[in-house]
Amino acid sequence: MADTYVGAIDQGTTGTRFMVFDHGGHVVANSYERHEQIYPKPGWVEHDPTEIWENTEQVVTDALDSGGIDASQLEAIGITNQRETTLIWDAESGRPVHNALVWQDRRTTDRVEELEEAGKADAIRAKTGLQPDAYFAATKAEWLLDNAEPLKLAGSRASDLRDRARDGELLVGTVDSWLIYNLTGNHVTDVTNASRTMLYDIHEMAWDDELLEEFDVPEAMLPEVRPSSDEEFYGHTDPDGFLGAEVPVAGALGDQQAALFGQTCFDEGDAKNTYGTGSFYLMNTGEEAVESDHGLLTTVGFQMSGEPVQYALEGSIFVTGAAIEWLEDVDLITNAAQTAELARSVDSTDGVYMVPAFTGLGAPHWDGRARGTIVGMTRGTRKEHIVRATLESIAYQTRDIAEAMEADSGAETTTLRVDGGAVKNDFLCQLQADILQTEIARPEVDETTALGSAYAAGLAVGYWDTIDELRDNWQIDREFDPEMSDAEADRMYGRWDDAVERSLDWATEE
């Protein structure tokens, strides 16, 4: 196996990466390309699907070239993707009918409030495990069918979008489906991505007729739902296409479930938190779909071929790494690495709290109209205090989730496995250990999202035989133990709720 590998396409919110892994789970080739963030109106966020696909072709080609690897040496390709981001495309031409609506997009908040006012939220939550929110795909698909620009569909009229969809001439999907379609020609998604649409019954493991009717999304346009690691494969790449080889596409997971898989959280009670644009804290709950009483989501964790679905509890935090990007945008820092130095330069925030609710608040608050807030400033407040408060906000939001997770599951997390770009920041990792009063374990391979999708694909084709091999690959880079007292952590966390309260229900005019 020394000369064969597994590739992973990691299509994220800000860019697309292709990583090639060897049997030991080590990265042997890597390429990354950013794509444009499109903001047509306040609260609206879009991506160009064509740009995403072109970037995917580019990073796959560049990574293989840089690693001196021929595409024929890839035993399989796995896919992981920004979840909930939704697009519709023409089945014959492959042309998107509109930009993709990104998971952060809030344009359907009014529609979600209609559902809540009509008393439908509990029924939706019971079937899907999801708190109705503009975050998920259902209202995005509905909006696209109502509003997609008809001029992008040659010869069609605005009124016939749903007719064409019912006839299977239009396809809808999350980004994994878009990539699988372009790679293989097949319309497929996996169970984890399906579970994020708000159209899928996670108990029956099927598209739900009542939800499809509620959002008027024809079933004919939906992808086939398959296991996350699929021994029957989703399809093969075209040997006459850009890769020049026929490679099985055999695994897919939404990015947060991929990180759960990559962190080898295969057992009930295992938990991880990924710090990316947002942060997503998942705990494996085994074969039981645990219902949350504390604002968490019940979701599909993963499924391997021929095996039962593994469920998870999830706390979705919409803005963490994006708050660091905001500090750059407003010139408080010049790069993300600078945050640790600035935060260490002051002993505290001097009472400043920052709530980074730029796109509303996710778990456990679920307020789509919350907005970013800084409170507690005085004339003596400096940028160092605001930078430190921003890092602390990441730790506080994570504690919100950890407390809800323990309340719902009845299990206390003794070690939290962390990954994502922000965990390279030792100050943040130590701060997180202190605020949670929990050990933080950072793995050697921190690109666990890509690694998880590679593992799923590799298991499907027999590159790895068992999940025990994957457990053996997982190695700790560093552990962070709490250095702060319980009392001090509680004191700092104590005013966080007050700050959050001031951010709620702000964007009343949107």
Name every feature range the model reports, one short phrase each.
Residues 1-98, 126, 240-248, 436-440, ...:
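N-terminal glycine/serine-rich phosphate-binding loop of ATP-dependent small-molecule kinases
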Residues 15, 83, 222, 297, ...:
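Short glycine-rich loop/turn motifs
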Residues 6-9, 109, 115-128, 135-189, ...:
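Active-site core segments that coordinate phosphate-bearing ligands/cofactors
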Residues 15, 71-74, 167, 220, ...:
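Short secondary-structure junction motifs
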Residues 222-232, 340-345:
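Short linear loop/turn motifs
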Residues 65-103, 128-137, 180-201, 226, ...:
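Short beta-strand-loop/turn "lid" adjacent to the catalytic site in phosphate-handling enzymes
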Residues 25, 48, 77, 105, ...:
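Residue-level signal for inorganic ion chemistry
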Residues 28-29, 75, 222-226, 250, ...:
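A short, local hydrophobic-aromatic micro-motif
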